[in-house]
Regions:
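Conserved nucleotide- and phosphate/pyrophosphate-binding catalytic cores
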Residues: 1-165
Length: 165
């Protein structure tokens, strides 16, 4: 039911293949609880389809999180650990990295997770990582009109934007 809105927005091809349809069902399931009407889904899907690392760093609503006492240490440690292993990010791998970041930085809760969420979505709030990460990884492999950046691409873009700011 949401497919026509994504096609009109240029986010899905006119005739998606089966893999794209299966992936798209996961996208809708992830985002539907956060909208009131189906036509709001493509805009909400911006966190999947549109990456603006510089904009995320400059966003006023992210300032408090990024200005937190441990935010720079958490981000630097996360980026270093995630880049060290070039394998595809999975929820399990992410959890292991975050446990290592937690131990190394002695940070937990929102001070640990919100800065990393900004790397992946451009916002300090959003979907659960265990649901989002597979969508990003799978989407990056599909023939979509707009490329979905996987987690490594998002980390790289954030690192570049962060060094430029």
């Amino acid at each position: 039911m949401a497919e026509p809105y994504f096609i009109k927005a240029g986010l899905l091809p006119e005739n998606p293949d089966e893999a794209t349809r299966t992936w798209f069902a996961k996208v809708v399931a992830l985002l539907a609880p956060s909208v009131n009407k189906l036509d709001e889904l493509p805009e909400r899907a911006g966190l999947i389809f549109k990456v603006d690392a510089a904009g995320a760093l400059a966003a006023a609503d992210n300032a408090e999180v990024l200005g937190g006492a441990k935010a720079n240490e958490v981000l630097a440690t996360f980026i270093e650990m995630a880049e060290a292993d070039k394998s595809t990010m999975t929820p399990e791998r992410f959890k292991a990295i975050m446990n290592d970041v937690k131990a190394k930085t002695e940070t937990k809760g929102k001070d640990l997770f919100h800065p990393v969420r900004i790397v992946f979505t451009g916002s300090h709030s959003g979907p659960e990582f265990d649901k989002l990460i597979p969508i990003l990884e799978e989407g990056s492999q599909l023939p979509l009109p707009v490329h979905v950046m996987n987690t490594q691409e998002r980390i790289a873009a954030f690192k570049v934007a962060r060094s430029a700011s």
